[in-house]
């Protein structure tokens, strides 16, 4: 699961306060609430938490008066079925994002026309963002999340009200995630690869810019400089792909087997050790993981 979960650091949506432990239902509920605001389909959404946060949340249910919830929470730290989630799990293989040396609010965007057209980014869903005014040689890490002043999140489903084609915006700022490690030059300038792209109109609008253009917007990051932030994530099953393919069967080897079940293909090959007179079995799989739709998930911290 480590390879699959490592993709969760590329979710740009983040709720809660960076570094805070999840210890209350309200702290956890911010995640399914955000998924609903992002129009993520219900039914196949799951939450995965670090043991520290999972046990913290389990403690929130020990005082309930429903025996089927309180007893497992006390005896096995088992999480009940949670509204908005098909299931909630704990894993010690979630990624840990170590923030860059950038400070919380330091840099500015540098360029008046830094928006994207859907047709140009539809296969990558990313863009470059030219920035300046950072500290010299400041670093930015893949998984760093930030907002731009005056750039708000939008309801991805609703269209305009008849007087405008713009989607209605929420009261909170749109978040963006850094996709690649970068370092500012000696003058504090850097070009960041980010997702989602800034699409400010049309059916695939990702944000609403209340500013005249995209120049000089304050960049505010989630988490302090060099902060260590374990990732909790809630997401739809279609957000991340796990792909395998059947391996070729070796020629001249008997008793080989290959089986594909629910899209996962495994090959078994007998290996005879003639020196030690031992029969061994080799199991092989080839696979890859990939974030395929960052719109279908969110990271979360405690309140």
Residue spans for each PLM region:
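Core alpha/beta structural scaffold of self-assembling particle/tube/pore-forming proteins
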Residues: 1-303
